[in-house]
């Protein structure tokens, strides 16, 4: 992709302007804001300068190659640069392409059993463990915020916070309906059953992004219970918060009531923030119908066929036969990376349109 020089000059000009303003700024809030923009622009500006340097070298080699005596000497260098420049241009184009501003955010993961009764709850449990193990391989921290266990195991619903760099960017394409085809442990005649679970991945909202009025909240406490209905706590420590304007309900059921309130508020902010994002997305939906990971919760995004050891992601027609390793979390990148690549292709196409 040939990037317009005017766009590259614009990046460098803005980077230098921010650097100059940082040196003169005295207001703390402005310094923080400029520092953040500087950190975002720096790798882009450096990439622009590297590309300019290599392009200049390539132009010099063309001049040298016009001399018959020098042409043979510089042929290999020209070939090497002709291979390197398009790669650098694509990397730079991705930096310039429209980005999800929550790409690097931590996330709230919600997994719920769908159709299929006990088997759906067991599958929801399998999915959560897959994400939990994947998070470990990425060095992310997982904290369970609320849980409702299935009668035969697994989860009717489980909500967890996943903290780390780039969590939302890697997991956001997991949102949707996941379908499983397998023989349940309770199936005496060996028949294959189909059930489903839903996954929602929400970017964790910054405090400054969502304002919640205390008067809009109803906060209830209740006694949390574990599997089989056994009371875990002697006191009413679990917290349920209802956001009255939207009807959104969040819960947290750890031992500390203070911690539960803080966690529930964090999850409420994430839910309200996600609603804001979806409202903006729906306004742009006509222009983005083909975008991978649109977040449509009603969409069946993936099928896990245990008898065949097959995983199929329906959005990009990807079929893999390493189901066991994917469910262990070891090979989940085999699904995530192609989805990210498809998203990058969409963003590059959008960038090219903006240049035309």
UniProtKB/Swiss-Prot annotation:
Function: Peptide chain release factor 1 directs the termination of translation in response to the peptide chain termination codons UAG and UAA.
Organism: Caulobacter vibrioides (strain ATCC 19089 / CIP 103742 / CB 15) (Caulobacter crescentus)
Any one annotated GO CC term: cytoplasm
Subcellular localization: Cytoplasm
PTM notes: Methylated by PrmC. Methylation increases the termination efficiency of RF1.
Pfam families listed in its UniProt record: PCRF, RF-1
SUPFAM superfamilies associated with the record: Release factor (SSF75620)
Domain of life: Bacteria
Primary subcellular site in the record, as a coarse category: cytoplasm
Gene3D superfamilies xrefs: 3.30.160.20, 3.30.70.1660, 6.10.140.1950
Protein family membership: Belongs to the prokaryotic/mitochondrial release factor family.
Single GO term (MF): translation release factor activity, codon specific
Modified residues (N5-methylglutamine): 230
Keywords: Cytoplasm, Methylation, Protein biosynthesis
Keyword Iron belongs to the record: no
Disordered: region residues: 279-299
Compositionally biased tracts (Basic and acidic residues): 279-289
Protein known as: Peptide chain release factor 1
